[in-house]
Amino acid sequence: MSHHPDLSVSLDQLLLRKEVRVRQQGEWLKRHSLPLVSFTVNMPGAVKLNAASQTVMDAGMRAIQELCQKTGWRQVACQLLVEKTGPEAFVVIQAPSASMLKKAMMKIEREHPLGRLMDLDVIDVDGHIISRQGAQLPRRRCLLCERDAVICARSRRHSVEALLAKIEEMTHDYSCCA
């Protein structure tokens, strides 16, 4: 995976983008009064916008559209953002409830070949993020060793290079087989 220095992002840039994203989420909730899917890509390292993150975003958006077609849920609004901090999307979906929508998003995260690289947050109309624990679902597993991903990330158990190599393999296999 090539690392173009102009695409590297700092922690400050990531935190600033997160602040802006939270504000945008609030605006979307106010405008639509429906649950919101806030989609970002889990990408380790300083470069968040690359071919792999774009592949994951495209695959995730297709999976969300297929889910809506299959369930009859209406996709009311959608916006894709290509930021230096990584691709993002906001999707407003008219689902029976925010918790049902979260369960469906977690099913994509769990079953899609690239789902472990997708962060599909669901925010209810009151602005609360529906958590995995709140939906009684297990925490994410590490890409490399199947332990709790949060513990591996905090302890830096695996190198960024090893994680990026695994992601490159996953996105390559997906692109070849999709």
Swiss-Prot record:
It comes from Vibrio cholerae serotype O1 (strain ATCC 39315 / El Tor Inaba N16961). This is Probable apo-citrate lyase phosphoribosyl-dephospho-CoA transferase. Transmembrane segments: none annotated. It catalyses: apo-[citrate lyase ACP] + 2'-(5''-triphospho-alpha-D-ribosyl)-3'-dephospho-CoA = holo-[citrate lyase ACP] + diphosphate. GO terms for molecular function: holo-citrate lyase synthase activity. The lineage of its organism: Bacteria, Pseudomonadati, Pseudomonadota, Gammaproteobacteria, Vibrionales. It is an enzyme of class 2 (transferase). The keyword Membrane does not apply. InterPro entries: CitX. Transfers 2-(5''-triphosphoribosyl)-3'-dephosphocoenzyme-A on a serine residue to the apo-acyl carrier protein (gamma chain) of the citrate lyase to yield holo-acyl carrier protein. The keyword Cell cycle does not apply. Belongs to the CitX family. HAMAP family: CitX. Keywords: Nucleotidyltransferase, Transferase. GO terms for biological process: prosthetic group biosynthetic process. It holds the Pfam family CitX. The gene is citX. Its EC number is 2.7.7.61.
